[in-house]
Amino acid sequence: MSARLAAIVLAAGKGTRMRSTLPKVLHPLAGSTILERVLAALGELALAECFIVVGQGAELVRGRIARPGVQFVEQTEQRGTGHAVQQVIPHLEGFEGEVLVLNGDAPLLRPSTVAHLVEKHRSFAADATILAARIADPGGYGRVFLDADGRVRQVIEDRDCTEEQRRNDLINGGVYCFRWPALMTVLPALSADNDQGELYLPDALPMLTHVRAVAVEDPQEIFGINDRLQLSQASRILNERTLVGLMLSGVTIVDPLRVTIDETVEIEPDVVIEPETHLRGATRIAGGCRIGPGTLLEDTVVGAGTEILYSVLRRSRVGAHSTIGPYSHLRPGADVGSHCRVGNYVEIKNATIGDHTNAAHLSYVGDASVGERVNFGAGTIVVNYDGKHKHRTEIGDGVRTGANSCLVAPLKLGDGVTVAAGSTVTEDVPCGLVIARSRQVVKPDWKAPYERTEDG
């Protein structure tokens, strides 16, 4: 598309119904934020300029959204959508192209829908083209009124409609494409003569000569978020889109109503996702895996043929054909190799685990480098913290630890070392067997003091 296109995203609203200290547009949604999802809807367009009008929490919005090609314009006093667009006028001086205006709280828009609106606007040679939809319950939305030729005659906010006007089910989707020189001529004439005393952008439409409407195919796309309930509804819609796309691409999702997956997650065909599984962020899962039930993966990479159930993995990596869980916890920096077993109540943090290594139950491995074909006995603990500093442990290939062993860092165990059960190892062991425990003492005639007679 021509680069003579600019976009204005309206993100200055107070969002009072969210009842939050966080700006509404920064609330998390499907792996990003509401505002980032709106910006993603502009992805198919070549924009000359992109402006975000900010108000409430402006610095927070700038901090999260700052990126090349995006400019922030502050609306210090929130006096309506028309007033918000007026704040951009000095930044588009001399601009002769088209301007898209869209709300920053409408995260369900598809890029193809926005691109289609621009294409239709150009084919109409209109002064303005708006996105509209017919919905069963139009309450809360501005109504679009057409003339006999199908052109937009007027858009009236819901609160300003009469009872008869509210029966109109054609609603304003809050997405506009304007010929900027035409809009510039009428913006100063906007009036605050309405119930809220605000300057409404739709009030500019009757002042323009040629205004058209384009119907959106999926009315859900123009869904706006004003409170936590609507945020949850938008989340459910986006999750359904993601799950449908994955299932059509060859992923089995056993119960879609009990699975959530961010659209940023990548899953290859022939993966089975069990119920109560939640996949977040930059997670990538290779083919042939079984994930869940009862599993959370965040920013985690999983190799082919691996099984993970009833476990939590964050910013971790698991190689191919390994088994994780049940009830394992892989914390950031965990890097588990191929053909490994990480079992019941095992926690791994900031540690690399070599191929064919097993930690089957009740172990903690933190800040460690572990070789291949290592076997951790039940209850093996890598003691990495001295109360002030973390220290590393290096464990060579083929090491075996007995049950209830403690490896106190900093420590190095050479290839093939065996640690006897119950040992607390505090010094490096280059090879062989290490036994580091108190000698067992048996007193067969011992009695508790309260059981002893006076004769002893």
Curated annotation (Swiss-Prot):
Residues 250-456 are annotated as: N-acetyltransferase. Binds 1 Mg(2+) ion per subunit. It is found in: Cytoplasm. CDD domains: GT2_GlmU_N_bac, LbH_GlmU_C. GO terms for molecular function: glucosamine-1-phosphate N-acetyltransferase activity; magnesium ion binding; structural constituent of carboxysome shell; UDP-N-acetylglucosamine diphosphorylase activity. Its main location: cytoplasm. Its cofactor is Mg(2+). It catalyses: alpha-D-glucosamine 1-phosphate + acetyl-CoA = N-acetyl-alpha-D-glucosamine 1-phosphate + CoA + H(+); N-acetyl-alpha-D-glucosamine 1-phosphate + UTP + H(+) = UDP-N-acetyl-alpha-D-glucosamine + diphosphate. Pfam families: Hexapep, Hexapep_2, NTP_transf_3. Its EC number is 2.7.7.23, 2.3.1.157. The active site is at H361. Residues 229-249 are annotated as: Linker. Acetyl-CoA binds at A378, N384, Y385, A421, R437. UDP-N-acetyl-alpha-D-glucosamine binds at residues 10-13, 24, 75, 80-81, 142, 157, 172, 226, 331, 349, 364, 375. Mg(2+) binds at D105, N226. Residues 1-228 are annotated as: Pyrophosphorylase. Keywords: Acyltransferase, Cell shape, Cell wall biogenesis/degradation, Cytoplasm, Magnesium, Metal-binding, Multifunctional enzyme, Nucleotidyltransferase, Peptidoglycan synthesis, Repeat, Transferase. Pathway: Nucleotide-sugar biosynthesis; UDP-N-acetyl-alpha-D-glucosamine biosynthesis; N-acetyl-alpha-D-glucosamine 1-phosphate from alpha-D-glucosamine 6-phosphate (route II): step 2/2; Nucleotide-sugar biosynthesis; UDP-N-acetyl-alpha-D-glucosamine biosynthesis; UDP-N-acetyl-alpha-D-glucosamine from N-acetyl-alpha-D-glucosamine 1-phosphate: step 1/1; Bacterial outer membrane biogenesis; LPS lipid A biosynthesis. InterPro entries: Bifunctional_GlmU (IPR005882), GlmU-like (IPR050065), GlmU_C_LbH (IPR038009), Hexapep (IPR001451), MobA-like_NTP_Trfase (IPR025877), Nucleotide-diphossugar_trans (IPR029044), Trimer_LpxA-like_sf (IPR011004). It is an enzyme of class 2 (transferase). GO terms for cellular component: carboxysome; cytoplasm; membrane. In the N-terminal section; belongs to the N-acetylglucosamine-1-phosphate uridyltransferase family. HAMAP family: GlmU. Homotrimer. Catalyzes the last two sequential reactions in the de novo biosynthetic pathway for UDP-N-acetylglucosamine (UDP-GlcNAc). The C-terminal domain catalyzes the transfer of acetyl group from acetyl coenzyme A to glucosamine-1-phosphate (GlcN-1-P) to produce N-acetylglucosamine-1-phosphate (GlcNAc-1-P), which is converted into UDP-GlcNAc by the transfer of uridine 5-monophosphate (from uridine 5-triphosphate), a reaction catalyzed by the N-terminal domain. This is Bifunctional protein GlmU. It comes from Gloeobacter violaceus (strain ATCC 29082 / PCC 7421). The gene is glmU.
